[in-house]
C-alpha cells in the first residue's frame, strides 16, 4: 500500500565547510512509499514508455516495479553473485540503444577460486514481457580478485558518446589504487560492446591495464553525468572523514591513499598518506571532513519543480538522509538535507522521467520512495 508523508529538510551547521550556504527557512518534502519489504535494494533504472523500473537487490535478485502492478517476481537469467559483506548484485543501467536491443547491463561481485571476490560487469537482453534476462554475457572482470567483502564500487554510467564507465573500489587493499597493473581503485572505460576504446589514456603503455580511465579511487558509490556540462561526476567514501566528489579526467590520479582528507578508523593517519594536497594528484571539487557515507547521486534535470533546478542530490548511508547541493559549473555547495527523519540508509537516488525524485533505502525491509518538494 502506498503511504504519504511530509519530511523536513535539516540545514546543518558545519563550520569546517567554508563553502556552506544556507537556503534560509526550512522547507519540507512530500514522500510517498511506492514499495516496501525490499531486501537491501541497491540500484534502479527507469524503463521507457511508462513501463516502470528495474530494481536490483543485493542478495542477487532483479525485480521489475510498475505503478498499478507493483513488484514482480525475480527475473530469471541474472548471473550468480557473491552476496557477502558489501558484495552482491549491484548496479543496473539500460544500454543507449535499449529501444532496439533491449540490452541491460549489470554489475555484481563474483568469487574466484581462492575465495576472494571482485566486481564483474555484463549485459543481457530484457524480455518483452519483463520476466527474464536472456543471453547474459560477462564482458569485464576486476582482476586480480582481492576482496574479502569490502569496497567493490560497481556504479555504471554511459556517457553521451555511448562509452560505459565502471567505478571500481580498491577491495580494501589501499596500495592497489595506485597500481596501474591492477583494476582496484580505478575508473574503467569501455565501449558499448565491452571492448577497450582506442583512445583510452594507457592503451599504448606496457604493464598498464588499458581499461583504466583514471585511478587513485577508494570506494566509489555514486556516479552520474552532469546534464549541463556533459561531464562525468563521481563520489567516493573516504575512511574516517574525507568523502569526496570528483570530476574524473582522462589519465588523472585522484590520490588515494597518498592524498586524503580523512584518517584511519583507528584515529591514526593512513600509513601511505603524504597529506591532503599532494603533487601529482587531483583535488576533489568537494569533500566532507565528517563522512556522511555518500551513495547514489542524481542531478535534477527536469522542469517539473523549478526550486530544484541546478541541484545535485546524494544519498547518505551513515547519516541516513539525502544531501541537497547547488551546482554552479564545476563548483558545488551543500544546501541542506532531506529525509532526515526516516532513519534509513539511503542507497540510490534518481531523477525520474516524470520529474520526481526516486530513492531506495538500504535496509532488510528497504523502501522505494517518491519524493517532491512541498511548497
Predicted regions span which residues?
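N-terminal export leaders
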Residues: 1-7
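Beta-propeller blade signature
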Residues: 120-129, 180-192, 248
Amino acid at each position: 500500500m502506498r503511504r504519504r508523508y511530509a519530511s523536513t529538510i535539516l540545514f546543518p551547521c558545519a563550520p569546517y565547510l567554508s563553502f556552506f550556504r544556507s537556503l534560509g527557512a526550512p522547507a519540507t518534502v512530500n514522500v510517498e512509499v511506492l514499495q516496501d519489504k525490499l531486501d537491501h535494494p541497491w540500484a534502479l533504472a527507469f524503463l521507457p514508455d511508462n513501463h516502470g523500473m528495474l530494481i536490483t537487490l543485493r542478495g542477487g535478485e532483479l525485480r521489475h516495479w510498475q505503478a498499478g502492478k507493483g513488484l514482480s517476481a525475480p527475473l530469471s537469467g541474472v548471473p550468480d553473485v557473491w552476496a557477502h559483506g558489501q558484495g552482491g548484485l549491484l548496479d543496473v543501467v539500460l544500454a543507449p540503444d535499449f529501444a532496439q536491443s533491449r540490452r541491460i547491463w549489470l554489475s555484481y561481485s563474483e568469487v574466484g577460486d581462492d575465495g576472494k571476490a571482485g566486481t564483474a560487469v555484463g549485459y543481457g537482453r530484457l524480455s518483452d514481457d519483463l520476466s527474464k534476462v536472456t543471453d547474459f554475457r560477462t564482458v569485464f572482470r576486476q582482476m586480480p580478485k582481492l576482496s574479502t567483502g569490502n569496497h567493490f564500487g560497481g556504479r555504471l554510467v554511459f556517457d553521451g558518446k555511448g562509452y560505459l564507465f565502471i567505478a571500481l573500489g580498491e577491495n580494501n587493499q589501499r596500495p592497489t589504487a595506485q597500481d596501474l597493473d591492477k583494476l582496484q581503485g580505478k575508473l574503467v572505460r569501455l565501449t558499448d560492446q565491452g571492448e577497450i576504446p582506442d583512445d583510452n589514456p594507457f592503451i599504448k603503455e606496457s604493464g598498464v591495464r588499458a581499461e583504466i580511465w583514471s585511478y587513485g579511487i577508494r570506494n566509489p558509490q555514486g556516479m552520474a553525468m552532469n546534464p549541463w556540462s556533459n561531464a562525468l561526476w563521481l563520489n567516493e567514501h573516504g575512511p574516517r572523514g574525507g568523502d569526496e566528489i570528483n570530476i574524473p579526467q582522462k589519465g588523472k590520479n585522484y590520490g588515494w591513499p597518498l592524498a586524503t582528507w580523512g584518517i584511519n578508523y583507528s584515529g591514526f593517519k593512513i600509513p601511505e598518506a603524504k597529506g591532503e594536497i599532494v603533487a601529482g594528484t587531483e583535488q576533489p571539487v568537494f569533500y566532507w571532513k565528517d563522512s556522511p557515507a555518500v551513495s547514489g547521486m542524481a542531478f535534477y534535470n527536469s522542469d517539473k519543480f523549478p526550486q530544484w533546478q541546478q541541484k545535485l542530490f546524494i544519498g547518505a548511508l551513515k547519516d541516513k538522509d539525502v544531501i541537497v547541493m547547488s551546482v554552479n559549473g564545476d563548483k558545488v555547495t551543500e544546501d541542506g538535507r532531506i529525509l532526515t527523519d526516516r532513519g534509513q540508509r539511503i542507497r540510490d537516488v534518481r531523477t525520474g522521467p516524470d520529474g520526481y525524485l526516486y530513492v531506495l533505502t538500504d535496509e532488510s525491509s528497504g523502501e522505494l520512495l517518491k519524493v517532491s518538494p512541498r511548497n
